[in-house]
Swiss-Prot record:
Residues 1-23 form the signal peptide. Binds 1 zinc ion per subunit. It is found in: Secreted, Extracellular space. The gene is Cpn1. Residues 418-457 are annotated as: Disordered. Residues 24-338 form the Peptidase M14 domain. This is Carboxypeptidase N catalytic chain. It comes from the Eukaryota. Belongs to the peptidase M14 family. GO terms for biological process: bradykinin catabolic process; protein catabolic process; proteolysis; response to glucocorticoid. Zn(2+) binds at H86, E89, H216. It holds the Pfam family CarboxypepD_reg.
Length: 457
């Protein structure tokens, strides 16, 4: 493999093997063909799958990039991009198609930065969460007479106001005591949400996502949780109702990573509005209930932000190349942010993987849990932290760990069974526990230690 420092690699290199995605709007059939084309051009590092159907039966396709597609490798984080949640906000959809082609192309070009990203990260790209709404908006095209035409799904529901409301539950718990993570869903949640929302919820419950971005249009700003205001205020002339999460500093940093890598988002003045550093707390801008980014944070291990990417919800075709060039580096840098903080394995005395162990950081009232393979990921900024792992039936263990800026710090926990109480405990598949084991490809073997000690450059 040639030694090509990523700092000097141009991000956009044309490959003689890959036909680039053209800068045009892609209707549903065209989108599907494009995803299949990218998959066929890079079959060893991609998997195309669907997470469900829209109201009108269109598949919600996801393109996965990984050196072992379809398999979760312990200590390798999962990250996702979601586009076109509002059917008439289309730039995210087109950017994600361009990104898919770009990752495939640059992997084949042996771009060291992209090679490392795909080898150390499992990336899931959902270009269109609302294909039915898109088709309605696309029938009008950029010259829209109705600003909201196609925004909702085929049942007329705004999908970003359709997730179970967990904020109210969390705000109550914050004052009165109660869980601060993985808040439960109501028993009837499946009957209360739309097919597209249900598909996404089942998707994010099935994979241990660590980081995510959700793409919108109509402004240019990186929006971070919470979206729902404690004061129940709605959009108005004054932004005074900031509703920070316990991870507010981290979320601001994630938002700034995107805004400052973007061509112009960080400048602040865009679309006739001003956001310092090109970022905003969601509720400080305007409060919304039942949004997707708050749901990710309160119900799963995933940290999600919302990216408003264009003043025009449906940009003209001739603007797409400029938008891609303005977003390309930001899209890559944001994916790389999943490799920060701490990660590790939670084991019992016999070195069996433990799933569902709770990882707490002193001073941050938001916990994460270990996944079904016993691995956990906790995004943190550089600093020194006191971290505790605990599981029912085991004595908790606390360590002090220093997190640096160059990549994740590996912190494993081996928990001893409590002598005073005995509880049933879940053990994750693997290490003699069954389940689907990774079958390494002999042509691309990796040293397992690389998963523990490195992240993208």
């Amino acid at each position: 493999m040639p030694d090509l420092p990523s700092a000097f690699l141009p991000l956009l290199l044309l490959s003689k093997f890959v036909t680039p995605v053209t800068f045009r709007h892609h209707r549903y059939d065209d989108l599907v063909r494009t995803l299949y084309k990218v998959h066929n051009q890079c079959p060893d590092i991609t998997r195309l799958y669907n997470i469900g159907r829209s109201v009108k039966g269109r598949y919600l396709y996801v393109l996965e990039f990984s050196d072992y597609p379809g398999i979760h490798e312990p200590l390798e984080p999962e990250v996702k991009y979601v586009g076109n949640m509002h059917g008439n906000e289309v730039l995210g959809r087109e950017l994600l198609l361009q990104l898919s082609e770009f990752l495939c192309e640059e992997f084949r070009n042996r771009n060291q930065r992209i090679l490392r990203l795909i080898q150390d990260t499992r990336i899931h790209i959902l270009p269109s969460m609302n294909p039915d709404g898109y088709e309605v908006a696309a029938a009008q095209g950029p010259n829209m007479s109705g600003y909201l035409v196609g925004r909702n799904n085929a049942n007329g529901v705004d999908l970003n106001r359709n997730f179970p409301d967990l904020n109210t539950y969390f705000y109550y718990n914050s004052k009165n005591g109660g869980p601060n993570h993985h808040l439960p869903l109501p028993d009837n949640w499946k009957s209360q949400v739309e097919p597209e929302t249900r598909a996404v919820i089942q998707w994010i419950r099935s994979l241990n996502f660590v980081l995510s971005a959700n793409m919108h249009g109509g402004a240019v700003v990186a929006n971070y949780p919470y979206d729902k205001s404690l004061e129940h205020r709605f959009r108005g002339p004054h932004r005074t109702s900031n509703s920070p999460t316990p991870d507010d500093e981290l979320f601001q940093t994630l938002a700034k990573v995107y805004s400052y890598a973007h061509g112009w988002m960080h400048q602040g003045w865009n679309c006739g509005d001003y956001f310092p550093d090109g970022i905003t707390n969601g509720a400080s801008w305007y409060s919304l209930s039942k949004g997707m980014q708050d749901f990710n944070y309160l119900h799963t291990n995933c940290f999600e932000i919302t990216l408003e990417l264009s003043c025009d919800k449906f940009p003209r075709q001739e603007e797409l190349q400029r938008e891609w060039l303005g977003n390309r580096e930001a899209l890559i840098q944001f994916l790389e942010q999943v490799h920060q903080g701490i990660k590790g394995m939670v084991l019992d005395e016999n070195s069996n993987n433990l799933t569902g162990a709770v990882i707490s950081v002193t001073g941050i009232n938001h916990d994460v849990t270990s996944g079904e393979h016993g691995d956990y990921f906790r995004l943190l900024l550089p600093g020194t932290y006191s971290v505790t792992a605990k599981a029912p039936g085991y004595d908790p263990k606390t360590v002090t760990v220093t997190v640096g800026p160059a990549g994740p710090t590996v912190v494993d926990f081996q928990l001893k069974r409590s002598s005073s109480q005995v509880y049933p405990v879940q053990r994750a598949p693997g290490r003699g526990q069954g389940g689907r084991a990774k079958q390494p490809r002999t042509s691309r073997k990796k040293d397992p230690a690389t998963k523990r000690h490195r992240g993208p450059a």
